[in-house]
């Protein structure tokens, strides 16, 4: 009799994806982030569902409904903070996952990589709209500032912004539609993640050496299932430490003040995971230029396969490229720091230099360094 795991139409899909999947024998913990992102997504959908049961998307009651969740709903406070800090964990895993892909040359799997970039944009859009929902000061002004950026688009800009707002300012219509989109997008993300996985399993996983590992594969279960469970436990440990000991560490105190269109907060800034892009946006004095730089700072990932000039796939045996990669990582941390600072003397120039460095490293220095390394090996 055939094993039900291998014969049942549904079980067969699960089996081929998570049990009998041939995986390289040498993939490191950097390959854990895919499964961690899956766990984050499930966690966000579940906590979000329970929050949506008590939330009201009306400008008059949105803020007080969130307060009601924290004070009156059974375990509402933990659900709310797991959802808020779960977003931070999601982005930590996302950036690590993308960084891993850049370091080990995983972007040569074109379909997988491009769907990954689309996923990144979708998750960023979802997180932005979710931040608007509590209707605090930073929610309102963040929504106003970021949606206003679209007015930089020539000719149709202003009409486009008013169409998104559903009026002449961020108001009830905006909040309601943002709630609707924030609810539906995670399911679209889940579907895209399955397509992402489908394309990955067409080629098989990359590995730290970047060399094909077809002759040295091991079954995913039990080797990588147990490894993923360890990663998941660490993720949940860090998340619960945040939730139970410092739930507001990564948030903005301004968001505990109800939204007031007549009072602008002194420093409008997004959540920490968008600060690097926000710093790039602010470093260009021109509005349209800033918006283009902001979009291109993420869209540049699409160009990674085109910018790959090395004869080797991975950076494992390329010390000069490794050095540049970690300079890029430090540069992104610098941009994140600058994004949270006020627009005044030392910060403006630091932000501009860090922004130039970001594009220079990816577009010029990395491809040039790869060519130099090729010449070292007489290739």
From Swiss-Prot:
Membrane spanning stretches: 33-53, 77-98, 113-133, 178-198, 226-246, 288-308, 320-340, 347-367
Cofactor section: heme b
First-listed, main subcellular location of the protein, grouped into a coarse class: mitochondrion
Compartments (UniProt record): Mitochondrion inner membrane
Gene Ontology CC: one annotated term: respiratory chain complex III
Any single Pfam family the record assigns to this protein: Cytochrome_B
Protein name: Cytochrome b
Name of the gene: MT-CYB
């Amino acid at each position: 009799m055939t094993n039900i795991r291998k014969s049942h139409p549904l079980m067969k899909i699960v089996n081929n994806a998570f049990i009998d999947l041939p995986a390289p024998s040498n993939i490191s913990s950097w390959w854990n982030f895919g499964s961690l992102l899956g766990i984050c997504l499930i966690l966000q959908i579940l906590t979000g569902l329970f929050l949506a049961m008590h939330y009201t998307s009306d400008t008059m009651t949105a803020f007080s409904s969130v307060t009601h969740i924290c004070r009156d709903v059974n375990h509402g406070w933990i659900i709310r903070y797991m959802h808020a800090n779960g977003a931070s964990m999601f982005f930590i895993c996302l950036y690590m996952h993308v960084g891993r892909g850049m370091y080990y040359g995983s972007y040569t799997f074109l379909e997988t990589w491009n769907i990954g970039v689309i996923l990144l944009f979708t998750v960023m859009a979802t997180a932005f709209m979710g931040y608007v929902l509590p209707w605090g000061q930073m929610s309102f002004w963040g929504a106003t500032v970021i949606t206003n950026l679209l007015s930089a688009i020539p000719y149709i800009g202003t009409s486009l912004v008013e169409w998104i707002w559903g009026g002449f300012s961020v108001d009830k219509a905006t909040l309601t539609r943002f709630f609707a989109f924030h609810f539906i997008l995670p399911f679209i993300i889940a579907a895209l993640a399955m397509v992402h996985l489908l394309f990955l399993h067409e080629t098989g996983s990359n590995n730290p050496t970047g060399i094909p590992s077809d002759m040295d594969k091991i079954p995913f279960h039990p080797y990588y299932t147990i490894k993923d469970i360890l990663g998941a436990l660490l993720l949940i440990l860090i998340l619960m430490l945040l939730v139970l000991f410092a739930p507001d560490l990564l948030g903005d105190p301004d968001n505990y003040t109800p939204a007031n269109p007549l009072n602008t907060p002194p420093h409008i800034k997004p959540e920490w995971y968008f600060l690097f892009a926000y710093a790039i946006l602010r470093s260009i004095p021109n509005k349209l230029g800033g918006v283009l730089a902001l979009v291109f700072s993420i869209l540049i990932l699409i160009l990674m396969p085109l910018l790959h000039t090395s004869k080797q796939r991975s950076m494992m045996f390329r010390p000069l490229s490794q050095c540049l990669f970690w300079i890029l990582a430090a540069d992104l941390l610098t941009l994140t720091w600058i994004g949270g600072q006020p627009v005044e003397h030392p910060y403006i120039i630091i932000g501009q230099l860090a922004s130039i460095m970001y594009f220079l490293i990816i577009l010029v220095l990395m491809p040039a360094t790869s060519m130099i390394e090729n010449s070292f090996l007489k290739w």
